[in-house]
Amino acid sequence: MFLWLKCFCTLIIVTIAKNSSAKIPHCKYDETINISHFKRLNDAYIYEHFEIPANLTGEFDYKELMDGSKVPTEFPNLRGCICKVRPCIRICCARKNILSNGECSDGVKNEIKLTMLDLTMQDILLTDPTLAELNMIPQYNSTELLILREQFQPCDEIVSLKRDEYTILKDGSILLHTSAEILSNDQYCLYPEIYSDFPETIRIINRRCYRNVMPGIAQLSVISVVGFILTLAVYLSVEKLRNLLGKCLICSLFSMFMEYFIWTMDYFRLLQSICSAAGYMKYFFSMSSYLWFSVVSFHLWELFTSLNRHEPQYRFLIYNTFVWCTAAIPTVVIFSMNQMWENDPGKSEWLPLVGYFGCSVKDWNSSSWFYSHIPIVILNSFNVIMFVLTAIYIWKVKKGVKSFAQHDERNTTCLEFNVQTYIQFVRLFLIMGASWLLDQLTRLAEDSHLLLDTIVLNLTVYLNAAFGILIFVLLILKGSTFKMIMER
């Protein structure tokens, strides 16, 4: 028994030692460089006239990409924490410029020149000097400031600073004079566009929050995509489901499928070369899905309230023209905005910035209400009005024909069939509306740092990811649909 316990403890110690050797204390992976082929002199490695002590080195059997994911390497490589011996500063890289190997292809140089104060963040926190005292401290002129690349994050805030509004410290931290706030070099990054007035004016990206994809979300999204595919396959293969209402629903489901498919492909980093194009497509299909459901709600209202049961020959063509053209208009608008003002940080608050924070449209600040949230609110409000009007009409008709139910069972059966169709689409509408509402509440909670890591917030995230599964269960896994499939 004692021998087994001894072996177990030895195994734990060896495992801890192995894991600890793969990391350098108080040094992030992106602050290290590969020094496997550099000379070792005494107890240090020489890199471009800089000495990296052996205690700032470690062996890594993986490569960490810009998005934080880790890729195993064929052989372990020795890395040294260069930012402990040389000033480093981060410059953000747009998602569309990140290559498959984790490098950034926006052409920004590896070094920049900045005047820095001969103090560290720790010195400022300990002494708490005034601005006048800071001006008397010698400056640290660095011509070899190493550039670290980091991708944009949701909730990032672009801030423009004049020369007298900031001070760069020699450890890469920045002191903001107006707010007396100190940001460490991993709490901000520089905007990738360096202008002629640099460094008299710099533009920094203030990290307001970090969003990490929760465990299982990607897998749920893959299953949702499969759910959309199966639902579409059933509707396309069963002739009774391909009436005008069914065709509109097929188009709506296809739009939602494309939206989820693009998000899933983006998560697995399969859109490297077409990130911006995929972002515009995702926005286009997102608008299309809500427009198609507005068409469905309008058609249901017209179907129930109109005395003329004859469907116009070109009605579906009219619906198609309306939806796709209407969705294309805001897509062209945000594309034009990005093309004209993308390189102007002063207008960044109003830009959708497709391809910067992901292969999608920026949708968390106030300006996103104009090209994302307000159109969806209008469409959802229209859907509510249509469904309420239809419900009122059905209630009145059922009340009116109740006394004639025994005399004309055929009309009652027809009415019951239409009511069941209506109820089915009401359920679908409620799921879509609830999904959008939960998504907005999730973003609001994250941005306000409310309900973070709570069951309520986590549940809404998982429900949104599983939307394709809910659609499949609602529309396919029921007796009437199975009966149509068997009769096909």
From Swiss-Prot:
One of its GO terms (cellular component) is plasma membrane. It is a multi-pass membrane protein. The keyword Glycoprotein applies. Glycans are attached at N19, N34, N55, N141, N365. It is found in: Cell membrane. Residues 18-215, 269-283, 337-373, 438-454 are extracellular. InterPro entries: GCR1-cAMP_receptor, GPCR_2-like_7TM, Methusela_ecto_dom_1, Methusela_ecto_dom_2, Methuselah_N_dom, Methuselah_N_sf, Mth_GPCR. Gene3D superfamilies: 2.30.160.11, Methuselah ectodomain, domain 2, Rhodopsin 7-helix transmembrane proteins. Residues 237-247, 305-315, 395-416, 476-488 are cytoplasmic. GO terms for molecular function: G protein-coupled peptide receptor activity; G protein-coupled receptor activity. Residues 1-17 form the signal peptide. The chain crosses the membrane at residues 216-236, 248-268, 284-304, 316-336, 374-394, 417-437, 455-475. Keywords: Cell membrane, Disulfide bond, G-protein coupled receptor, Glycoprotein, Membrane, Receptor, Signal, Transducer, Transmembrane, Transmembrane helix. GO terms for biological process: cell surface receptor signaling pathway; determination of adult lifespan; G protein-coupled receptor signaling pathway; response to starvation. Disulfide bonds join C27-C81, C83-C88, C92-C189, C93-C104, C155-C209. Belongs to the G-protein coupled receptor 2 family. Mth subfamily. This is Probable G-protein coupled receptor Mth-like 12. It comes from Drosophila melanogaster.
